[in-house]
């Protein structure tokens, strides 16, 4: 599992929502 990629996607999603 590529945690950095997952966290990156979550970070982008959060940034888009905020």
From Swiss-Prot:
Residues recorded as bearing Isoleucine amide in the entry:
18
Tissue expression as described in the entry: Expressed by the venom gland.
For this record, the Gene Ontology CC terms, alphabetical, are: extracellular region; membrane; other organism cell membrane
Keywords attached to this Swiss-Prot or TrEMBL record, sorted alphabetically, are: Amidation, Antimicrobial, Immunity, Innate immunity, Membrane, Secreted, Target cell membrane, Target membrane
Q: Which segments of the protein form a coiled coil according to its record?
A: none
* Keyword Membrane set for record: yes
Supply one GO BP term. Answer: innate immune response
Q: Which family does it belong to?
A: Belongs to the MCD family. Mastoparan subfamily.
What's the protein called, per UniProt?
Communis-AAAA
Tell me the organism. Answer: Chartergellus communis
């Amino acid at each position: 599992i590529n945690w950095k990629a997952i966290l990156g996607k979550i970070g982008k999603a959060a940034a888009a929502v905020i």
